[in-house]
Amino acid sequence: MQAIKCVVVGDGAVGKTCLLISYTTNAFPGEYIPTVFDNYSANVMVDAKPINLGLWDTAGQEDYDRLRPLSYPQTDVFLICFSLVNPASFENVRAKWFPEVRHHCPSVPIILVGTKLDLRDDKQTIEKLKDKKLTPITYPQGLAMAKEIAAVKYLECSALTQKGLKTVFDEAIRSVLCPVVRGPKRHKCALL
């Protein structure tokens, strides 16, 4: 069985842990608990191939900036996550997460993931954003960011409703099984 290491990064509270727990247990977790590191493992079938998907959660908070890259070696694919209802987390894809991932792993495929899809059309959430003169991130904005950072895919999902959730991980696996070759040959991440 082929093993694939998938590392999930993004700002604190964008829903990385919920994404992983909802996917691996089919249940949405309760309270927000900041993550230091957690690993999940899932045996899945994608395109009739059995895969052992190793899922690595990371802490988005700045306190962990020096610790987080320790989970990067041998990564096969990164999920860079942002919340569709948190424009600052979207900007940090460009400002922080893409540069960090590319610095440590120059050729590992990236999938850009917009989380909390269920809240994009939520009236209360829209009002809260409006009070701050903000709006949710749109699908075209996400696509444009994915193109800018040369992500292999842009996907949106909800860990709460599970809409689009399985697709995120299926596409992460496909990005490793069927790589889109862009420029130099892809190598696994190695820290020197």
Curated annotation (Swiss-Prot):
Entry's Gene Ontology molecular function annotations: GTP binding; GTPase activity; protein kinase binding
InterPro entries, A to Z: P-loop_NTPase (IPR027417), Small_GTP-bd (IPR005225), Small_GTPase (IPR001806), Small_GTPase_Rho (IPR003578)
Propeptide position ranges: 190-192
In-chain residues carrying the UniProt-annotated modification Cysteine methyl ester: 189
Renumbered ranges of motif Effector region: 32-40
GO cellular component: cell projection; cytoplasmic vesicle; cytoskeleton; plasma membrane
Gene Ontology biological-process entries: actin cytoskeleton organization; actin filament bundle assembly; actin filament organization; aggressive behavior; cell chemotaxis; cell projection assembly; cortical cytoskeleton organization; defense response to bacterium
Record's bilayer topology term: Lipid-anchor
Keywords: Cell membrane, Developmental protein, GTP-binding, Lipoprotein, Membrane, Methylation, Nucleotide-binding, Phagocytosis, Prenylation
Intracellular or extracellular location(s): Cell membrane
Residues that coordinate or bind GTP: 10-17, 57-61, 115-118
Oligomer status and interactors: Interacts with Pkn (via N-terminus).
NCBIfam families: small_GTP
Listed name of the protein: Ras-related protein Rac2
The organism's taxonomic lineage, starting at the top: Eukaryota, Metazoa, Ecdysozoa, Arthropoda, Hexapoda
Gene for this chain: Rac2
